[in-house]
Amino acid sequence: MFSMATAARLQGHIRLAGARSLQRLPSAIKTPTPLSRAAFATFPKAAYASTASAEKRPFTADKFPHLKRSESFKKLSDKDLDFFKSILAPSAISQDEGDLEAFNNDWMQKYRGQSKLMLKPSTTEQVSQILKYCNDNMLAVVPQGGNTGLVGGGVPVFDEIILSTANMNSIRSFDALSGALVCDAGCILEVLDNYLAEQGYIMPLDLGAKGSCHIGGNVATNAGGLRLLRYGSLHGTVLGLEVVLPDGTILDNLSTLRKDNTGYDLKQLFIGSEGTLGIVTGVSILSPKRSKAVNVALLGVSSFEQVQAAYKRSRDELSEILSAFEFFDQASIDLVKQHLVAGNNDPLESSHPFYVLIETSGSNKDHDDEKLTNYLEGLLTDEIVQDGVVAQDTTQFKNLWAIREGIPEACSKSGTVYKYDLSIPVPVFYQMVEDMRARLDKAGLLGKDKEVDCVVGFGHIGDGNLHLNFAAKRYSEAVTNIIEPYVYEWTAKHAGSISSEHGLGVFKSPYLHYSKSPSMIQLMRRIKTMLDPNGIMNPYKYLPEK
């Protein structure tokens, strides 16, 4: 809690979220429940893609008719099953259609595969045996972690064998001096973070799906998340990887060294490769010390220019203690209040066009409180912000974060949502949202009684990552044609990237040319051909079809 002197300086300006104003905080907000296999069947059918039953929902192959099953891949045979049964326990093999349903479908119920077999190895050696056999016998494979992806990268397109890392969930070692953690790829991110918390450390990434996503999947998709501003991307925090190549070769590079200047840094090839070059089975990652002093403030501002001004000043005045700088617009918080907050509570006294959530973390509370106080006072004096609250305990800390983390779930409550994850230069960040609203409005598709209820923008100002969501009643070809490929053309025109942290999968692979040159795509194809000449690893994704 802020000291009495600090609190006195802030009274009448930024409100401390203490006992007197506790009712103003969204204490009744329902923190989004992490997805799990057990919860899959009860997750709202309206979420994201479809209100249809699984039997009526179209297969991914039908939704992407340009994709054709490769004739070079074999169909699964009894001989193949006999081999898998010879190396795996019966509980690690699933052929039951009902059991496979949760693994053939993504959690958004947008992508639906047709796999007849799921394998759940528990060791790297078993993964090696499986991939060698599949490569020798031309059986396509889809690696799957927690299945929390958003672009269809972790589910089959046709009848590929699903190789789940769920049984590979052991922590192998932790060095309390260096902070180097070595673990299996199937470890759940939140489990790792809780383990490190007991040691005084923290995972360098944090995601809304942390209760279900696997660290191997995080690495394979180069997941970003809420801590990237402070700790950087996985390209910097991953120290080493254990990867099984398509031919079964085990690439043992689980180094815990901070510095190793011998040869090519091969692990970087697999970070963000989405399971197309091999399967990550082990991860060595550098975990930073957990901060002893953490503050969270939610601020209301009147324009995106003021959001930028607040961010610039935070880099100048909060610098080394700044750990997150998130923004969301009024449409975002309105959806959260409508769908996730009991009693329509608002953390601030009135609505604002934009909101900023700032987190600081450090080792000296008095020092951090003083810096944050000076920063907030300056914003108020210069009329950069109009209102705000500062969390005073762990519950309020979580409640303020729950607003930001609840936006994706709230967007889905209208029936479905179109999701775009873009890297855009901050000065034109919000122009994308405004242009898309104008485009849909001109087409007569935007409004409570129209196809699209609202367009919302939120994301990570600190790394230029915009989450552009369209909350709609249902999927519509008319809406899709208005959004695509315009959203990618706009991004390319402003020197952005069509995928900031969600990856490419089956959804964005046809649009890769908006972010990468022909020569770069050709080099990617050559790398793919070199490491996976038979093309068995996660086919039909990542790279555009020729």
Language-model features: where?
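Noncatalytic alpha-helical scaffold of FAD-dependent oxidoreductases
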Residues: 2-546
